[in-house]
């Protein structure tokens, strides 16, 4: 491999996207090869500059490529279409067409891994798990396929309420060594599983490690901040979450990543919980305008943003209805753990019917059991039960829920 391309690829692997772009352009000037073109396109795409990447990729004639070359070109082309150009249907159709053209088993496994990642982001984690499981069980899957499949499986498992395999899957994704943002996909799975297991200190510690490991001014740093803010919101550290989310949202806004809409969703939730009604409304509007098929995995978070914004506007029934819709959206997508978190918020907002929903979900683990106890106590107007739930949530560091449950206990006593 020419020295210039190797240097650009190393910068890409290190997450230094600006340097990768500069080195990639220099390499392309010296050697108009497919390798140079692909390295430059990836550096541009990972900065959120999808149109620029598309121009670089469009210069390639796929009919003139061998199967390995076709794969090397098709994967970043599809990824760019899905995220950066916001054309998920086109990207999925393109990948399926490419899948029909390749003949080798390793190539098929790699395409299936990316199709699974697309399915996850499009709100179909169960389909994503089917594809990921096939890839991870295949002796033909290369490290790139394993990285994509394992990272997607880690996040899907966590959001679906299956926590036991999350760390192992994240480890497989890391060991695959594929560059990019996969560490944050699997990391979100890990922090989600830790929160749902009541280990909020470990969740926050991991999120901070991911932030610290990423270079500032890069999308990876902003995504790490997003994961940290999600844990802070679960803790009830809303004041601390807002500046983190504001920085992440601004950094991710120019990109096409699915993380971008999630940043606005979480920021709207946080601002609403602080009573900043106007600001929350503006952030909710941004979240709604940016949300689409490529971020459908996070539809429950958008509904929760509506719930908390309604609560800030003193629309109690609207808040409860939106929180219920968050839980229903999560359940429809098989995201049971996300549904439980939504229903905890529903109880905080005054929903007396959440207990039967939580019971139906059957999510095992610390938070699943605590959520059911809390919802049952609220439905029954059981002051002692609410006080016990407040103490239990406080003990694991979910202070926001603890404060609300304590207030509900006081109200149940007639205080």
Question: Which ranges hold each PLM region?
Answer:
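Accessible peptide chain termini
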Residues: 1-2, 415
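Internal alpha-solenoid helical repeat scaffolds
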Residues: 2-231, 243
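Helix-coil-helix junctions within alpha-helical repeat/solenoid scaffolds
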Residues: 64-67, 169, 190-415
